[in-house]
């Protein structure tokens, strides 16, 4: 989402700097450098919390940004907003990306203060906005994608499957941060149960995150570890979607994940946790399943293995519906630009530094 903004925003009118308190994908860092966008690295927020806030305040005080646009999942962004207020930044935007968080009690305690701290609330979906902002007003800004990149391409499929040594095997794909929310441990259980009876299936995991090492340890002990491929972070997700035959996302909670929009654009059927916003079904190719039963997921995978579908046609139809529903990256960024412009004009800012 942030990278699409960096790619398509009018940099004649807007200057962007990224303040990052997490690990940065190297390919994204390289792209930002090519685009002339500075990434200011903060101490890792979850490991060095005090140092993170100290450095954040110094930067906000020195830079005096016109707009401070915060991405988060809960009212735990309140300290960031408070520091921006102390630093004299008047235009604070909050962008919600999830429908719950790891610390819901703290979220509820901070919510009354949080809702006094921002000028504009944005959300990737209605459910995410309701979770984050309660009865306060917010605007839905869809997580747009570059639709053309994800269009199904047989040559990309052949190339990537050759790269990962896949022939005619049925390849199940998953992409997401390795953490409790994305529920990879449940997925590994489902795969073990399904692989026991289906010799021709494989599992591909793309992503990284705080639980990466622990999940890798579980894979090492997995009865079918030789059938599991771990990519880590990948800048070739368009190739990944083309290579796989089915996409799975058993998350414990989500707003409207970008990976689901991308997977649908590539003509994939997606098996998705029923805790994910149903707004994510843009193509009619999503099946929502409970995450308390491995049997249900196993049966759904079996059904997909037996299907013979025209991926090219599915991709074309899905792309039309994605565009109709305004999930195109360029349109999303144009909408965000308008939000920035309106706020700047309303509050008299002219530099438009974000």
Feature roles, as predicted:
Residues 1-4, 170, 174-193, 210-216:
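A conserved mid-protein helix/loop that constitutes part of the nucleotide-sugar donor-binding site
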């Amino acid at each position: 989402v942030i990278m699409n903004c960096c790619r398509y925003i009018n940099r004649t009118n807007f200057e962007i700097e990224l303040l990052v308190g997490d690990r940065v994908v190297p390919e994204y860092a390289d792209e930002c450098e090519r685009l002339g966008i500075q990434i200011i690295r903060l101490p890792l927020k979850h490991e060095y919390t005090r140092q993170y806030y100290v450095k954040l305040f110094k930067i906000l005080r020195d830079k005096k940004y016109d707009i401070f646009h915060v991405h988060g999942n809960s009212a735990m962004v309140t300290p960031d907003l408070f520091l921006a207020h102390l630093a004299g930044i008047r235009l604070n935007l909050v962008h919600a990306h999830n429908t719950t968080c790891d610390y819901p009690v703290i979220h509820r305690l901070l919510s009354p203060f949080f809702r006094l701290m921002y000028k504009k609330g944005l959300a990737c979906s209605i459910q995410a906005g309701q979770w984050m902002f309660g009865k306060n007003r917010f605007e839905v800004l869809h997580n747009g994608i570059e639709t053309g990149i994800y269009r199904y391409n047989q040559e990309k499929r052949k190339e990537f499957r050759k790269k990962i040594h896949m022939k005619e095997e049925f390849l199940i794909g998953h992409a997401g941060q390795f953490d409790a929310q994305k529920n990879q441990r449940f997925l590994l259980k489902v795969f073990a149960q399904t692989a026991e009876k289906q010799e021709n299936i494989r599992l591909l995991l793309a992503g990284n995150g705080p639980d990466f090492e622990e999940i890798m340890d579980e894979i090492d002990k997995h009865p079918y570890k030789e059938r599991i491929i771990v990519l880590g972070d990948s800048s070739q997700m368009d190739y990944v979607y083309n290579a796989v035959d089915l996409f799975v996302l058993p998350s414990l909670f989500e707003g409207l994940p970008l990976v689901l929009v991308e997977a649908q654009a590539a003509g994939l059927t997606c098996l998705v946790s029923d805790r994910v916003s149903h707004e994510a079904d843009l193509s009619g190719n999503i099946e929502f399943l409970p995450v308390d039963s491995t049997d249900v997921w196993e049966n759904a995978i079996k059904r997909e293995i037996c299907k013979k579908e025209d991926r090219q046609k599915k991709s074309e139809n899905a792309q039309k519906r994605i565009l109709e529903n305004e999930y195109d990256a360029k349109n999303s960024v144009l909408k965000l630009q308008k939000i920035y412009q309106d706020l700047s004009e309303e509050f008299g800012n002219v530099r438009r530094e974000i």
